[in-house]
Amino acid sequence: MLPTIFPAMSALYLTEKLLPEPADVNRSFDAFDSMNFPELAIIRDSRIIRYYTEERPAPQDLKSYASLNDRVFVLKLTPEVKAEIFDLLSGHYDAIILETFGIGGIPEYDDSFEKAIFSWVDSGKTIAVTTQVPEEGCDLGVYQVGKKFSNHKGILKSDDMTTESIVAKLMWILGQTDKPDEIARLFYREINHDRV
């Protein structure tokens, strides 16, 4: 039975592979692949071949959460997206997951994106920055167009987290708190290998 293989870890078993759940992405007919984290195991001929053997104790007390905030929006930057999108979203969403160009490029046609992003964060809303290149991770400090955002404490850096993992984590976090410091603390806390 699979749950006893890695008792303190959530995983998905498909096509002979055991993958860490927060790192799963749908890629093709084979359904899922693990992004930025190794496969946990494969199963061949009813045999388990383990690749990842770190044992983590199960928490003593299970804590359940009943509150999620579904006001989280994924914004994939494309050349035609205008900064006004932030104004359109502000009445409907509490957080934006910003999928940047490359590993951290944000448009710099003028200062409208900079103003929109800082205005969003300064209004108490949340922005998590990620990439459209999942196997590379996100690093705002690499390109000039991302550097001005890299040191702002209100802009969450997703590093190598998958977009799907960021959505789930932010929905959970924002269901628990609206305090920026607590949001950041929970976001940067590793849960089930969602951050490597």
Regions found by a protein language model. Give the residues of each.
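Accessory alpha-helical/coil subdomains and C-terminal extensions
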Residues: A11, P20-I103, E108-Y109, I191-V196
